[in-house]
């Protein structure tokens, strides 16, 4: 399997929402990108809003690579850009050629959009911050903006402890035990990305059957294989991973404070339940919801459960929240969907 990745970055459409009173070249701003499908539209939007709300003195250019864009979403993003006098660029991509790559219900084809952003922008920019769309900013990016690269491929945050030994064993390299990173936050040295032809290397590795059989998190595992011994390590505050299902698992309303604190810059809401779901009624989700409530999305209801795995998790949250009738109804619906 040999993919023509240059063809993949021939976007079907590029839409620029530039509401700045004074225009700047992209290289004079801090560039941040997301890669999304329809399910993560609101996540990327609130991620942008959270950065702007917490970094009002900085100049940004925001880039969203998406396989679906509708008029309402574009209009709401335009309102967001107007509110903060910023620029948001939208890139519509055809996802069909990427569907030959490893994916699953949990890991959709959109996970590969970050690779396309690295490849596309490597010819245009020196650096790029990539964020997953389930990440919210709650602090200053000044230290990150001031970071300088030498020959590192980028700057990353080590994944949680539970991922380390398992990843080293899976990837057959003990060096990953203590250095395996989470790809949700990646500050990429695009000069080095271009020089080392890393997009091509990524797809070469993804075409290797001996590599494919080791993969559990397709793009993240490949990026780790490439970045081993070639990355700056950022402190945990830039990728504070929190899973909202911990609320009913731990049954402790303060549990999230072990992960999210005053130093936290980025909160990464991993797992099935996201803070934009209508059952995520917890203090841990307020960092997202507080921004949501001052955004153009504020009058739009939170997302309902649609997929089977969402219903499975939703009913457990509802029962924990003592919403017994709704919880039982959702559990029944899940069992019907399960068959």
From Swiss-Prot:
GO molecular function, one term: metal ion binding
Pathway the protein takes part in: Bacterial outer membrane biogenesis; LPS core biosynthesis
Highest taxon above the source species: Bacteria
Cited SUPFAM superfamilies: Nucleotide-diphospho-sugar transferases
Pfam families cross-referenced by the UniProt entry: Glyco_transf_8, Glyco_transf_8C
Cofactor: Mg(2+)
Catalytic activity line of the entry: UDP-glucose + [lipopolysaccharide] = UDP + D-glucosyl-[lipopolysaccharide]
Uppermost EC category: transferase
Keywords, sorted A to Z: Cell inner membrane, Cell membrane, Glycosyltransferase, Lipopolysaccharide biosynthesis, Magnesium, Membrane, Metal-binding, Transferase
KW Iron-sulfur (keyword) present: no
Binding site for Mg(2+): 132, 134, 268
Enzyme nomenclature, EC number: 2.4.1.58
Sequence positions that bind UDP: 35-40, 132-133, 268-274
One GO biological process term: lipopolysaccharide core region biosynthetic process
GO CC term (a single one): plasma membrane
Protein localization: Cell inner membrane
Sequence motif DXD 1, location on chain: 132-134
Annotated InterPro entries: Glyco_trans_8, Glyco_transf_8N, Glycosyltrans_8_dom-fam, Nucleotide-diphossugar_trans
Motif segment (DXD 2): 219-221
Task of the protein: Glucosyltransferase involved in the biosynthesis of the core oligosaccharide region of lipopolysaccharide (LPS). Catalyzes the addition of a glucose (glucose II) to the outer-core galactose I. Has a marked preference for its specific donor substrate, but it appears to have a relaxed specificity for alternate LPS acceptor residues, providing the overall size of the acceptor is conserved.
UniProt free text on domains: The C-terminal domain is important for catalytic activity and membrane association.
Further information: Strain F653 represents the enterobacterial R3 oligosaccharide core type.
Protein family: Belongs to the glycosyltransferase 8 family.
PANTHER family on file: GLYCOSYLTRANSFERASE 8 DOMAIN-CONTAINING PROTEIN, LIPOPOLYSACCHARIDE 1,2-GLUCOSYLTRANSFERASE
The name this protein goes by in its record: Lipopolysaccharide 1,2-glucosyltransferase
Gene source species: Escherichia coli
Species lineage: Bacteria, Pseudomonadati, Pseudomonadota, Gammaproteobacteria, Enterobacterales
